[in-house]
């Protein structure tokens, strides 16, 4: 039988990573040419520091309100930051750094909450099939991420290039349409894909209550299997003892 939650998680991951790569492909150009930030390395340093520091928070929030709801909070926050970037002008360093750090704060949620959701999905498969196929599921997740990143990057760069943005010459060498294309791709492009992902997360079927019942079912199955094995092992040992006693060979 098909694993509905698994297919939904894969679709969500595809959309989110497509949106992220759609923006990331042109991040350097937006930061350098639109905002004019002179120290891009410093921006990314604080971005990743905020991201790694926030991982425990997002995992805690996932346990508190449910992983899919926490992931919704992550996407809504990132979408709001993306929309706010549209109003930045050259020289708005402080506002950009603030928004960039907030986006970095959400990095942990974007990366780890889908993995946590997939771990729950593995339990659905285990309950239905009785087997452990976590490795296969995570391989599918990794493949989906790579597909989304490849397509998102290619589509994004081609759009801004075809509409007149010149990466080597920056704003001065680009058309007005090309500069606006860069703004829209960086700021609004991800929001489209986040919105589609949010629609799938909104009525996500594997709620915390359902997952708890599923875990209890798996625990009962494990206990029954352990009891059956113990009974079979005990029966085998007891049947072997008379044969040993009746052996005609001297000890």
Where are these regions (language model features)?
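Membrane-embedded alpha-helical bundles of multi-pass transporters/translocases
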Residues: 1-228, 249-250
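Short, intrinsically disordered terminal tails adjacent to the first/last structured region
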Residues: 223-251
């Amino acid at each position: 039988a098909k694993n509905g939650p698994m297919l939904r998680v894969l679709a969500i991951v595809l959309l989110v990573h497509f949106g992220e790569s759609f923006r990331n492909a042109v991040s350097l150009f937006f930061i350098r040419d639109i905002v004019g930030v002179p120290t891009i390395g410093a921006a990314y340093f604080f971005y990743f520091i905020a991201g790694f520091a926030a991982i425990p928070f997002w995992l805690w929030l996932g346990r508190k309100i449910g992983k899919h709801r926490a992931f919704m909070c992550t996407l809504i926050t990132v979408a709001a930051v993306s929309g706010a970037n549209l109003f930045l002008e050259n020289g708005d360093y402080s506002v950009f750094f603030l928004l960039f750090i907030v986006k970095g704060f959400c990095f942990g949620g974007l990366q780890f909450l889908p993995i946590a959701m997939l771990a729950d999905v593995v339990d659905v498969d285990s309950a239905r099939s009785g087997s452990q196929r976590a490795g296969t599921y995570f391989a599918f997740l990794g493949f989906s991420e790579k597909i989304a990143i490849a397509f998102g990057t290619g589509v994004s760069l081609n759009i801004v290039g075809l509409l007149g943005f010149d990466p080597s010459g920056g704003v001065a060498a680009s058309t007005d349409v090309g500069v606006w294309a860069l703004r829209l791709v960086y700021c609004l492009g991800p929001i489209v894909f986040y919105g589609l992902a949010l629609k799938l997360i909104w009525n996500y079927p594997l709620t915390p209550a359902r997952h708890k019942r599923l875990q209890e079912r798996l625990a009962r199955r494990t206990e029954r299997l352990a009891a059956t094995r113990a009974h079979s092992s005990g029966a085998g040992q007891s049947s072997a003892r008379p044969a040993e006693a009746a052996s005609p060979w001297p000890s």
